[in-house]
């Protein structure tokens, strides 16, 4: 290559390098900007769920009569708060179909645990799916058929009890997460427990009921 040709190409090479460097710096600035960082965090946090968790409404239930709610069984028979009187009742509000396997395992466990299917204690799982939709879960996990399940298809009861703003809700404002409400024989809420870890709670809940029943 002649010296003359080399000198002609050098400015263009320099310009190209400068443009690449400028574009790279610009990308890094945009990527690290607070607005972009916050947007990314918002997507990662709570699977895009709006609003911060708030359990005040749920916690306020303790010591009060269970609010008047309506739930339906697979045959569309309606159940209200009055129907839960007469024995200790554990209401397990959860995400249903979308919460596999954690919620399903808990529901199936309640169904097979004699302690929660007696004349003293009953466990009722509440999902926001329809009864027809829930049949797909039973087909996949037949053990779920033993669980007593009621349906809150419009999430009305879940909203009324404060289930949609808990820490465990992965779709905050729309669906419950993994929350328990213990109601005594007189229909008074004695204990609430929201579990973001979605662990099995049979033993803990049974012991809590024994403690409350002393």
Residue ranges and their predicted role:
Residues 101-159:
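Structural microenvironment flanking redox-active thiols in thiol-disulfide oxidoreductases
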Residues 145-148, 163-169, 173-181:
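Structural micro-motif
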Residues 79-110:
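Short active-site neighborhood of thiol/selenol oxidoreductases, capturing the structured segment around
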Residues 75-77, 186:
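Residue-level recognition of short loop/turn positions
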Residues 70-71, 182:
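Hydrophobic beta-strand positions
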Residues 172-214:
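Thiol-/selenol-based redox modules, centered on thioredoxin-like
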Residues 1-65, 214:
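N-terminal targeting signals for export/organelle localization
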């Amino acid at each position: 290559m002649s010296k003359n040709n080399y000198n002609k190409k050098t400015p263009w090479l320099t310009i190209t390098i400068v443009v690449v460097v400028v574009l790279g710096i610009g990308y890094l600035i945009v990527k690290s900007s607070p607005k972009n960082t916050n947007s990314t965090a918002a997507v990662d946090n709570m699977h895009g769920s709006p609003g911060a968790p708030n359990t005040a409404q749920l916690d306020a239930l303790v010591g009060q009569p269970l609010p008047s709610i309506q739930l339906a069984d697979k045959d569309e028979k309606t159940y209200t708060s009055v129907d839960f009187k007469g024995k200790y009742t554990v209401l397990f509000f959860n995400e249903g179909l979308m919460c596999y396997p954690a919620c399903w395992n808990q529901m199936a466990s309640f169904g097979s645990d004699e302690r929660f299917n007696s004349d003293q204690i009953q466990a009722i799982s509440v999902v926001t799916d329809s009864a027809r939709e829930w049949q797909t879960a039973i087909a996949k996990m037949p053990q779920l058929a033993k669980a007593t399940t009621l349906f809150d298809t419009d999430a009305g009861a879940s909203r009324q009890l404060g289930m949609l703003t808990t820490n465990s809700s992965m779709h905050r404002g729309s669906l419950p997460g993994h929350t328990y409400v213990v109601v005594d024989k007189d229909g008074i809420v004695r204990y609430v427990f929201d579990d973001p870890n979605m662990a099995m709670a049979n033993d803990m809940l049974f012991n809590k009921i024994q403690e409350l029943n002393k």
